[in-house]
A protein has these predicted regions:
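Short, mixed-charge low-complexity intrinsically disordered segments
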Residues: 39-76
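Short aromatic-glycine-(Arg/Gly/Cys) micro-motifs in beta-strand/loop hairpins
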Residues: 2-39
């Protein structure tokens, strides 16, 4: 979990353009995945962010990697 917190902090510092992302802790370590607003629309609620994070989590699970998902809204 410390690795995840470190990666979240680094993402906040190095990617100020990211409004939404989720951090996954999987078998191969922690990783940050961008939730691309441009793909569909701007998110209005955290429920929409969580839904997309859940969909992406399912995609990674299909590839054999399992992530514990922490959705984060880092900008207001």
């Amino acid at each position: 979990m410390m690795q995840t917190k470190f990666i979240i902090q680094m993402t906040l510092e190095t990617r100020p353009d990211l409004e939404y992302f989720y951090c996954g802790e999987g078998k191969s370590g922690a990783q940050v995945f961008e939730l691309k607003k441009s793909r569909a629309k701007k998110y209005d609620t955290m429920e929409e962010v969580n839904r997309d994070a859940f969909i992406l989590q399912a995609v990674h699970k299909a590839s054999g990697e399992t992530y514990t998902v922490l959705p984060i809204r880092c900008r207001t």
